[in-house]
């Protein structure tokens, strides 16, 4: 091998060894392997039956559904409108100081505003960097003064271990290449003497 290729070979070898040692130190956790138990147990399949909880009047959240409810245990639900407590709810018990509504005709319809769907809603995006708008303050007999509000940009600073290790490997690799290039150049300056 000539002197130039020998230096590059050593640089590549050192870089490969450095990368391998960094990879081994990164995967320091050894797998915890245990032998499976030798005894076997017979698994008996069981079926899980879920019972439906009894339906109560409290499960209804609107006047119409409460009044139209027909429960399995013949309970009549009544929509209660308690103005003093500012509370409306469905119950099977009558409460004093509350207005009872037993038919859908007595249920008041609350006007609702239409909720935009995905097809009509415009997506709102947050600006990537806040751009404060300057405000101009003027007073009688004074000069215009422009005041720009200051705000801190959002930062997500987290430590990334993989990038840190990659940076170390990169710096050490560059240093190894520079070192071997320096050694190569120094070896060319020597005078060779015959024996």
From Swiss-Prot:
Polar residues bias locations: 141-152
Chief site of localization: membrane
Keywords carried by this UniProt record: Cell adhesion, Cell membrane, Endosome, Glycoprotein, Lysosome, Membrane, Myogenesis, Signal, Transmembrane, Transmembrane helix
The keyword Membrane belongs to this UniProt entry's keyword annotation: yes
Entry's Gene Ontology cellular component terms: endosome; endosome membrane; lysosomal membrane; lysosome; plasma membrane
InterPro entries referenced in this protein's UniProt entry, alphabetically: CD164_MGC24
GO biological process: cell adhesion; heterophilic cell-cell adhesion via plasma membrane cell adhesion molecules; muscle organ development
Residues that carry a glycan: 26, 32, 68, 74, 86, 97, 118, 144
Record's bilayer topology term: Single-pass type I membrane protein
Membership in a protein family: Belongs to the CD164 family.
Protein name: Sialomucin core protein 24
Native species: Rattus norvegicus (Rat)
